[in-house]
Amino acid sequence: MARYDNIPEFETDLDGRGLRVGIVMSRFNQDVCEGLLSACTAELLRLNVSPELMRIATVPGALEIPLALQTMARSGRFDALIALGAVIRGETYHFELVSNETGSGINRVGLDTGMPIANGVLTTEDDDQALARMQEKGADCARTAIEMAKLLKQLQ
């Protein structure tokens, strides 16, 4: 039963059995991205997502993630998508541009297609921050993707 003034609440669990999950991962800052991927896929497996129902596409950098997500979302082959990448501040304005455009693009794809997308693109000041956050963020994206896929199915 709901926790909110006796109003019925949509309830989901984190059992990913039968869900088809697509992952788009940037190859830029590869060590961090592969750490995100490792944590993400380990959590997907823990949540009963079959390896046969997971697919990964790699792209050169963070700015290419939204287009790959959009194509996957429109394919009808996935129940949820996950974006993985790392944008680490340098000495130029490029960090803000890449961070803002990537985040905006990921959100736009989700809203335009109705596809749940977990955003696991880290934006950090330095490599140490990215390395410190990659495990938890990767696992969190897996949980978010499963929860939102199941919630959206209930809402329809």
Curated annotation (Swiss-Prot):
Ligand binding (5-amino-6-(D-ribitylamino)uracil): 28, 62-64, 86-88, 119
Gene Ontology biological-process entries: riboflavin biosynthetic process
Binding residue positions for (2S)-2-hydroxy-3-oxobutyl phosphate: 91-92, 133
PANTHER family according to UniProt: 6,7-DIMETHYL-8-RIBITYLLUMAZINE SYNTHASE, 6,7-DIMETHYL-8-RIBITYLLUMAZINE SYNTHASE DMRL SYNTHASE LUMAZINE SYNTHASE
Domain of life of the native organism: Bacteria
Entry EC number(s): 2.5.1.78
One Pfam family of this chain: DMRL_synthase
Family: Belongs to the DMRL synthase family.
InterPro entries, sorted: LS, LS/RS, LS/RS_sf
Keyword flag Transferase: yes
Name of the featured protein: 6,7-dimethyl-8-ribityllumazine synthase
Physiological role: Catalyzes the formation of 6,7-dimethyl-8-ribityllumazine by condensation of 5-amino-6-(D-ribitylamino)uracil with 3,4-dihydroxy-2-butanone 4-phosphate. This is the penultimate step in the biosynthesis of riboflavin.
Molecular functions (GO terms): 6,7-dimethyl-8-ribityllumazine synthase activity
GO cellular component: cytosol; riboflavin synthase complex
HAMAP family attached to this UniProt entry: Lumazine_synth
Gene3D superfamilies documented for this protein: Lumazine/riboflavin synthase (3.40.50.960)
Key words of the record: Riboflavin biosynthesis, Transferase
Active site: 94
NCBIfam families recorded: lumazine-synth
Pathway involvement of the protein, from the record: Cofactor biosynthesis; riboflavin biosynthesis; riboflavin from 2-hydroxy-3-oxobutyl phosphate and 5-amino-6-(D-ribitylamino)uracil: step 1/2
Reaction(s) catalysed (UniProt annotation): (2S)-2-hydroxy-3-oxobutyl phosphate + 5-amino-6-(D-ribitylamino)uracil = 6,7-dimethyl-8-(1-D-ribityl)lumazine + phosphate + 2 H2O + H(+)
